[in-house]
From Swiss-Prot:
It comes from Acanthamoeba polyphaga mimivirus (APMV). This is Uncharacterized protein L684. It comes from the Viruses. The lineage of its organism: Viruses, Varidnaviria, Bamfordvirae, Nucleocytoviricota, Megaviricetes.
Length: 498
């Protein structure tokens, strides 16, 4: 549960020779020279305990600020400047370490004086500090990310992280974000609908030209957003410091773990569906220490941990799970770990209900169900899905590139099952389902030549300018016909792929 501070500290307040009437010069005995405004910024930051990340914009004289602010002096720093404006990110080096490689790239928004940097931490956190331009510049963030990444030979490494890490974006957005905010929607990133970010601030944080009259602060321009939806931000009034107010956010992660084969090691080999069952239903079991240690770390970080098992909800099963936990280092935290039961069914509904962001399971049956649910848009909050291997006491992030290697061809069976039900499914769902099927069967070619012909006709019409309502109606009918033809063909030829 990281605690993040974002603050546009106003370059005019930070200058050594104040050009702003509301900031007075200070000379300290240690030889450092700074303004009363910078001192007030320092005093506020120093008053905030347990900060994990501090994101500053317009951070002129940030090195002086760090020297006179105790908690900042104990943190690691990353700074970016292309011309005049500087952004700086401070992070708690005791809790967070940058990835060993491919851990950072930089860029700018609509001008070189609107910089951003993107940092990747070993905790699977992607942190973006930015200062956007005015007039909706923030909505072009994808374009600026693509521009920066295309300059890098190893850009695919960064795309892989952007699409799987928990993302936190903080800074001066210069926009009130009155609509849902998505990033990575550009085709360059390879995820059809992008990733939604939560936590829009509705409290005014900008812009107070006299630095000491809070009633002049009317715009909610500063935000801390995250792909984790349990995100609460607060704007804190600070006078005679900056024309912006600081914003602090605490973000909580919801993490789920299967029980059999995840919290213990004693499971049979996978059955024909990829399901792994325990040797016996009552234990005792050998402890999966790597997972138990991970759970303890998440609890100590104040994240929410759930056990989500395929077992049925019975007194015996609850007793078995609690007895196992009592044998581990989690024995004093059992009351912090809710136990949920799917009763042998798909876990999608439970993961949705409890807003699970990360989930660990050893069953290919469940992994494929959840992975497909994620692709079809039914698990918008699930950022990471891990396949657990109890035989080797390891776990691995599931991606589009490795799922067939990890879990065979089970996912096709799930897609085929949904195709069989497609006659009563909404057209948009069918389109997504077809796209998913083709994505996992790259060599599949349509046998019906009419499909390719109609798809070309549809594309030609869509590319026309100034469509009238007759053409729009025709597009809907044409799309419906194409979907029905594709579904029919896939059903006829699906046996070749089983």
């Amino acid at each position: 549960m990281p605690k993040i501070l974002s603050y546009n500290v106003f370059f005019k307040s930070m200058l050594t020779d104040p050009v702003y009437n509301y900031c007075k010069p200070i000379i300290k005995n240690n030889g450092l020279e700074y303004t009363t405004c910078l001192y007030n910024v320092s005093k506020f930051i120093a008053s905030q305990k347990d900060l994990d990340f501090v994101l500053l914009q317009e951070a002129t004289n940030w090195k002086t600020l760090q020297k006179i602010t105790l908690n900042l002096s104990q943190m690691e720093t990353i700074s970016t400047c292309f011309d005049v404006e500087i952004i700086v990110t401070f992070y708690n080096k005791q809790k967070y370490q940058l990835d060993p490689i491919d851990n950072m790239f930089i860029g700018y928004m609509d001008s070189v004086n609107r910089p951003f940097h993107v940092l990747f931490f070993q905790n699977n956190i992607c942190l973006i500090n930015l200062h956007a331009g005015h007039k909706g510049d923030i909505y072009f963030l994808d374009k600026y990310l693509v521009r920066s990444l295309k300059k890098l030979d190893n850009y695919q490494k960064f795309i892989d992280k952007l699409t799987t890490y928990d993302i936190i974006i903080g800074g001066d957005f210069n926009d009130e974000l009155k609509i849902d905010f998505y990033i990575l929607s550009d085709n360059f990133f390879g995820i059809s609908e992008g990733r939604r970010l939560y936590g829009n601030t509705f409290e005014p944080s900008c812009c107070n030209p006299v630095l000491n009259y809070l009633g002049r602060t009317k715009k909610s321009y500063d935000h801390i957003l995250s792909t984790l939806n349990d995100n609460v931000s607060t704007v804190i009034p600070v006078v005679k410091a900056s024309d912006h107010m600081p914003i602090i956010s605490t973000i909580t992660k919801n993490i789920g773990f299967d029980f059999d084969g995840v919290l213990h090691l004693d499971v049979n080999k996978p059955d024909y569906e990829g399901q792994r069952n325990p040797y016996n239903l009552i234990g005792p079991y050998n402890i999966f220490n790597n997972i138990i240690n991970l759970i303890l770390k998440e609890i100590l970080d104040n994240n929410n941990v759930y056990i989500i098992t395929a077992r049925k909800d019975t007194k015996v099963n609850r007793s078995v799970i609690n007895s196992h936990l009592k044998k581990t280092i989690l024995k004093n935290y059992i009351n912090k770990i809710p136990i949920l039961f799917s009763g042998g069914k798909d876990k999608t509904l439970l993961l949705t209900k409890y807003n699970i962001n990360t989930f660990y399971d050893d069953s290919c049956l469940r992994i494929n169900e959840l992975f497909l649910s994620k692709i079809l848009g039914n698990l918008s909050n699930l950022n990471q899905l891990y396949f657990v291997d109890p035989d080797n006491q390891s776990y691995q992030l599931v991606t589009k590139q490795n799922i067939n290697k990890l879990c065979g061809n089970f996912i096709n069976k799930n897609i085929i099952s949904l195709l069989d039900q497609s006659d009563n499914t909404h057209n948009n769902s069918n389109i997504k389902l077809i796209s998913t099927f083709i994505d996992f069967n790259h060599n599949y070619q349509f046998r019906n030549p009419d499909i390719n012909y109609l798809m070309k006709e549809l594309n030609d019409i869509i590319n026309e300018n100034n469509l009238d309502y007759h053409q729009i109606d025709y597009i809907d009918k044409l799309q419906d016909s194409i979907v029905k033809m594709i579904i029919k063909e896939l059903k006829q030829n699906i046996n070749n792929l089983k």
